[in-house]
Amino acid sequence: MRLVILIASLLVLTEPSNSSALDQPGSSCDDLGALAADPLRQSEPVRFEDIQAKRLISACRTDIESATKAQDQARYYLQLGRGQLRDDDTGGAMASFNKSASFAYPAGYFAFGVAYLLGDDVGKDDTKAKVYLLLALKGNVVWAAKALSALHQNRASEFYDAKLAQNYLTLFQDSQF
């Protein structure tokens, strides 16, 4: 459950959005589930609480099957994972986030890195979390800096470093890459 809450907070509270899935005119995976933290998103972001899980899951599965570009498939898998998470299918969400990350998709790395950071539905692994979050940050996923700050703030982590935690937090707050 902690995984759902933190992933939801990191995948939801990214930036304010005036859009909601109910306002979206389209029925595509992008229109129904775009993540604000995704620098490669193709539509206005949809807040997590506004996701219509069943519609999003169906649209993403359809779009995955018809996608011809790997980047599009990766984005659709990320958004499919959001729908599955909204539908309380954490196992399905993890598989979708993993698939997105397997395409080297920056926001997919972010989602998977957060999962390893928390360690609820996958074994907690700070090393893997750091690797995935750094890959996400390299791909300009601003929210990865905040997750890295949390990792380095944790006194129980082998990566505890208060100064580095503050640097990542400042990077996140400044949103300068």
Regions found by a protein language model. Give the residues of each.
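Terminal, low-structured helical/coil segments at or just beyond the last alpha-helical repeat
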Residues: 25, 149-177
